[in-house]
């Protein structure tokens, strides 16, 4: 908070007061008294509001700003767990609004003005869908939403300006202040999706400007392990800031990016290519890293003839020399080196096994050994990246994942070795056909 103030920035707390609270449900004190079902709080219970009061008290102590994001997104099953058992079925709009009023009262108690994600109002009116072309809301809902709460329209998955236009129009059914949130798309795995996110942000921000939306921010979520480096999405952050100022000249933005970071924008977005230019936000650099060499659920998704990691690795080499951000490029270059072997290892293993080509299998064992070495290098660089950017909390997940991956590679190597010397008659996993992952 002090650092933000020194840089003339306002640090606004963003909490959850309805769903996405599964972490705290690990403790029986909360799980048994505060939760409706899954990660959704039990609306109407005193213990729930004691918990929320504590959240606001902490935020009031830690933050200078008296604006707060109270969350409330994606509570798809609100009112359908313990609440249903206790009260029977109730109109879920009414449950949501009842809870919102209680949370608003607590916010006001601590001097906060609130903003919240808007999706649940639309989902409850449209069969669970948020992004509907003809989004209409019951008049009583529009009337009952407290007017002092800003509504945040969030949208990370479209590049179509007309889509944003329609959704902003739908939000303007409310008399509330509307805020827009786009995303940096840095939450899909180890590599960013800068080019996709910049394109999406440009369309969205053009729409916001034309539709008089003044407040815009970029979300930088870190789902499922926070593997993507924090600064790997700098092209999105800078581009969004320039778009918001009315500058849509990519050449001009690229010059500014080079001046601020010391890296050519074109070289920086080479980070995206670790996913081999996958469609939209697909993340093969993650799922093929962890795909099992023998079970291969994702093997049918591969274009085996177009691995491309050697080419990407060479592009990333340029960025490794940058003083400030070189560590990002070193980590992802190392991942490319591991994926050069790992990406299609399962496909190659199954193919030579089924041909009963013992000479080729023996040669393949070298790949398993080399892969383990490259994974150890990647682990060390990824750990260095984590310690530079993050608190220790959370890396235990990567110890388990990457440690488990290396153990599985060793195990598969041993199984193949035993087969080659006659200790196994066959390898049943490799005799099964891999089913298509996507509908063909």
Descriptions of predicted regions:
Residues 2, 8-10, 49-57, 61, ...:
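Substrate-binding groove of N-acetylhexosamine-processing glycoside hydrolases
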Residues 15-22, 72-75, 120, 220-223:
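Short, solvent-exposed turn/loop segments enriched in Gly/Ser/Thr/Pro and often Arg
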Residues 17, 33-86:
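Active-site groove signature of glycoside hydrolases
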Residues 22-26, 81, 163-164:
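Short, solvent-exposed loop/turn and secondary-structure capping segments
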């Amino acid at each position: 908070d002090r650092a933000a103030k020194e840089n003339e920035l306002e640090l606004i707390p963003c909490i959850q007061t309805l769903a996405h609270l599964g972490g705290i449900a690990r403790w029986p004190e909360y799980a048994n008294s505060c939760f409706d079902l899954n990660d959704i709080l039990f609306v109407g219970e005193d213990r729930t509001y004691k918990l929320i009061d504590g959240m606001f008290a902490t935020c009031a102590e830690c933050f200078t700003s008296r604006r707060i994001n109270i969350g409330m997104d994606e509570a798809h099953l609100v009112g359908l767990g313990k609440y249903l058992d206790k009260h029977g079925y109730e109109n879920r709009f009414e449950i949501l609004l009842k809870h919102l009023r209680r949370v608003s009262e607590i916010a006001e108690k601590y001097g906060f003005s609130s903003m919240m994600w808007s999706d649940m109002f639309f989902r409850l009116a449209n069969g669970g869908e948020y992004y509907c072309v003809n989004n209409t809301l019951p008049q009583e809902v529009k009337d009952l939403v407290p007017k002092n709460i800003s509504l945040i329209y969030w949208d990370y998955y479209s590049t179509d300006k007309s889509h944003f236009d329609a959704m902003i129009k739908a939000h303007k059914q409310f008399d509330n202040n509307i805020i827009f949130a786009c995303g940096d798309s840095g939450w899909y795995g180890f590599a960013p999706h800068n080019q996709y996110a910049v394109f999406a942000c440009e369309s969205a921000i053009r729409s916001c400007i034309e539709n008089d939306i003044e407040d815009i921010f970029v979300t930088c979520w870190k789902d499922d392990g926070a593997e993507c480096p924090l600064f790997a999405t700098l092209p999105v952050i800078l581009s969004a800031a320039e778009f918001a100022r009315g500058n849509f000249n990519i050449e001009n933005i690229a010059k500014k990016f080079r001046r601020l970071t010391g890296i050519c924008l074109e070289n920086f977005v080479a980070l995206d290519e670790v996913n081999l230019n996958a469609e939209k936000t697909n993340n093969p650099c993650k799922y093929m890293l962890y795909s099992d060499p023998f079970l291969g659920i994702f093997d049918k998704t591969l274009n085996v003839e177009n691995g491309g990691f050697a080419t990407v690795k060479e592009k990333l080499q340029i960025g490794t020399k940058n003083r400030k951000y070189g560590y990002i490029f070193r980590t992802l270059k190392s991942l490319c080196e591991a994926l050069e072997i790992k990406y299609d290892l399962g496909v190659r293993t199954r193919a030579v096994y089924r041909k009963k080509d013992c000479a080729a299998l023996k040669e393949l064992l070298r790949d398993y050994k080399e892969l383990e070495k490259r994974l150890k290098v990647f682990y060390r660089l990824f750990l260095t990246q984590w310690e530079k950017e993050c608190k220790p909390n959370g890396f235990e997940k990567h110890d388990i994942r990457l440690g488990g991956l290396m153990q599985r590679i060793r195990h598969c190597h041993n199984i193949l070795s035993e087969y080659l010397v006659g200790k196994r008659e066959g390898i049943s996993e490799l005799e099964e056909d891999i089913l298509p992952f996507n509908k063909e």
